A protein has these predicted regions:
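Positively charged n-region of N-terminal signal peptides that target proteins for export
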Residues: 1-4
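Short, conserved beta-strand element in jelly-roll/cupin
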Residues: 95-114, 125-138
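His/acidic/aromatic-lined binding-pocket segments of jelly-roll/cupin-type domains
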Residues: 92, 98-102, 147-148, 155-156
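Bacterial N-terminal signal peptides
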Residues: 7-16
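Conserved metal-binding segment of the jelly-roll/cupin
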Residues: 148-169
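A short, N-terminal "cap"/entry segment at the start of jelly-roll beta-barrel domains
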Residues: 19-95, 188-196, 200-206
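A short hydrophobic beta-strand segment most commonly corresponding to one strand
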Residues: 171-187
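Short alpha-helix capping/helix-loop boundary micro-motifs
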Residues: 140-145
Length: 206
């Protein structure tokens, strides 16, 4: 019996050594985010951001900004009210941050395209530039843009440098936004910072 136990222990130790060697083998691909934890954002927290948007008349809010090794990933919640026609200089474009929208509620018309007319640099002091989506431009129109009718459940992918322009919002639209920031131009935001943000009035651009 003792011999069997010793053999089993030796096998276990050998297996552990083999696994460790496999992990540190320099010829193997290595994780781009070594020993990074996973992250969870509950629905209740996302709903708190939507409630805050309605109460304080906010549009875009950053819920998290997470380090994943070679990039930052931002999670935002956006609420937009009714829009009969687009405002002047309302095309948006971000130089380094790509965005993915998942529509939660409402309907709207969104135009996408890279050819933006009358580009104007967004101020570097702007809150969204500093904390949400980094440097970029606004513009008047998107030349040869493609329009999409958005509804709940839809997903939109907007690469960095692509113009995006809400031209009509029927009543309102709420969506969750994932921001991909490979150059890490936006600051990190954790759960504790999110709770602190939700506990008091939101900062605004001066």
């Amino acid at each position: 019996m003792r011999t069997i136990i010793l053999v089993c222990s030796a096998v276990a130790v050998t297996a552990a050594v083999v696994i460790a060697q496999q992990r540190i083998n320099p010829t193997d691909p290595q994780p781009t985010c070594a020993m990074c934890p996973g992250y969870y954002v509950p629905l209740s927290e996302l709903q708190a951001y939507t409630k805050k948007a309605l109460t304080e008349r906010l549009l875009d809010q950053q819920v998290r900004d997470i380090e994943i090794g070679k990039a930052h990933i931002g999670i935002g919640m956006v609420h937009r009210g009714k829009l009969d026609a687009p405002g002047a200089n309302s095309v948006a474009e971000h130089d380094q941050v790509s965005e993915v929208y998942h529509i939660i509620e409402g309907t709207a018309t969104l135009m996408l395209g890279p050819d933006i007319t009358n580009r104007q640099r967004r101020p570097s002091t702007q809150l969204t530039v500093r904390e949400f989506n980094g440097p970029g431009n606004n513009g008047d129109q998107i030349r040869n843009g493609v329009s999409y009718q958005l509804k709940a459940g839809d997903v939109v992918v907007i690469p960095a440098g692509t113009g995006h322009w809400f031209t009509k919002i029927d009543d309102h639209i709420d969506y969750l936004m994932v921001r991909i920031d490979p150059d890490k131009v936006t600051p990190l935001k954790n759960e504790a910072q999110s709770k602190e943000y939700l506990s008091k009035p939101a900062p605004r651009d001066q």
